[in-house]
Amino acid sequence: MIGKLKGTLEHIFEDYIVLDVHGVGYVVFISNRLRPSLPSVGEALSLFIETHVREEAIRLFGFATRAEQEWFCMLQNVPGVGAKVALAILGTLSPDELAQAIALNDVAMISRAPGVGKKVSERIVGELKSKTLPFEQAVKTVSVPQREITHQPAHDALSALMKLGFEREQAARALALAMNALEGEAVSSALLIRHSLKLLSSPT
C-alpha cells in the first residue's frame, strides 16, 4: 500500500493529477479544494495517499494533510458514502468545517457538496457524531467556519447571541454544546438561546 508520494507535478487534469516519482507517473485523484493550492507543473509536490484496490483497478487519492486523509476514510464508513462522495464533501468543506457541521447537526452545510443529498448528510451526522472527538474537545479544537450556519434554529440563535455582544466563535461553541445537550428534543431558536446563555454565563 502507498501511504505518501513525493515527486514532481507533471500534469493537472479535471479531477486528477499525474505525479512523477523517479520516472514513474502516478495518477492521483484530488479534491476541488486541493486544486487551487497545487504548485505549478514541474514543481515538487508531496501528498498523503489513500490506496483503493478493486478488481478492475487500483486508485490513488491524494491529500495535503493527514486530517483530510483520515476524514476521507471515516466518511466511507458511512453506508452509502463511497470514494466519490467523500472526495466531493472534502472538496466543499475543510476538515474543520466538516467537524463543525457534524457538531452542530448542520445537514444543509454537508449537503452543499455536489451529489450529496439530505438523506446522506443526515446519515453522515448520525454515524460520525459519536465517532469523532469527544464533543467538548471537538468544539474547542475546530475553528468556527466563516460561512453561514445553515441549520435554521442554530442560525437564528447565533445571530441573537452576536447581537447580545458575544463573539461569533464563542457563541457558536456554546450553541454546539447546547445542541448536543438537547439532542433528541424538538429544538427551537429560543431554547438554544436559553441553554447557550446558561453556558456563556457559567464560570470557566
Swiss-Prot record:
Keywords: Cytoplasm, DNA damage, DNA recombination, DNA repair, DNA-binding. It comes from the Bacteria. Pfam families: HHH_5, RuvA_C, RuvA_N. Its main location: cytoplasm. One of its GO terms (cellular component) is cytoplasm. This is Holliday junction branch migration complex subunit RuvA. The RuvA-RuvB-RuvC complex processes Holliday junction (HJ) DNA during genetic recombination and DNA repair, while the RuvA-RuvB complex plays an important role in the rescue of blocked DNA replication forks via replication fork reversal (RFR). RuvA specifically binds to HJ cruciform DNA, conferring on it an open structure. The RuvB hexamer acts as an ATP-dependent pump, pulling dsDNA into and through the RuvAB complex. HJ branch migration allows RuvC to scan DNA until it finds its consensus sequence, where it cleaves and resolves the cruciform DNA. Residues 1-64 are annotated as: Domain I. The lineage of its organism: Bacteria, Pseudomonadati, Pseudomonadota, Alphaproteobacteria, Hyphomicrobiales.
